[in-house]
């Protein structure tokens, strides 16, 4: 979990730890990662498998890496950990190019030369690493409250079908969440735009956890 000490990363790490997964919280500061792991264990309220390491060491010790850093830190983070990647790993990009990256509004996104943050991530990591876009539209506020189910849907995009299946299984392990195969990685462009819309809805309706629900599909991945 790169950026696991931040709000979104903390929330996802908490939910997966509570679901029985072994979770490694990564941070530029190992001490901050250890502290976040300790807080996750306390918040879970029951024994969980969670630890904290530097980002580089976290990548070395896991098969699925989840990137939750702000968009402004995406490139630097991936370039720093690039030597630690191993063939066959899956990178899940949660970062969204909101306009706040350049001092603008959180209700808008900025253009990305690669097309989307997910595609940008794919252009940086080794070709032997499969990149997946997922969890971009899930409220950190909701994830961080273990007393509530995550009653929203997760759109999963990737050019690697096996990597999508791995991430869809991770979605299933979060109480209340449903995963949908949203096609190729280029569809990240649409998925990331939805995040800005949800932020706008949060502001308009004075809430913090607006989410997405897909209807009309009886079979969920």
Locate predicted features:
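NAD(P)+-binding Rossmann beta1-loop-alpha1 motif at the extreme N-terminus of oxidoreductases
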Residues: 1-42, 173
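Active-site-lining helix/loop region of Rossmann-like oxidoreductase modules
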Residues: 2, 152-221
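Short beta-strand and adjoining strand-loop segment in the mid-core
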Residues: 104-114, 145-162
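A short helix-to-beta-strand connector/capping loop
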Residues: 43-51, 127-130, 177
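Rossmann-like NAD(P)-binding element
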Residues: 44-90, 96-104
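Glycine-rich beta-alpha junction loops
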Residues: 73, 95-98, 138-139, 160, ...
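General beta-strand structural signal in soluble alpha/beta enzymes
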Residues: 52, 92-93, 130-134, 179-182
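Rossmann-fold dehydrogenase core element
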Residues: 110-136
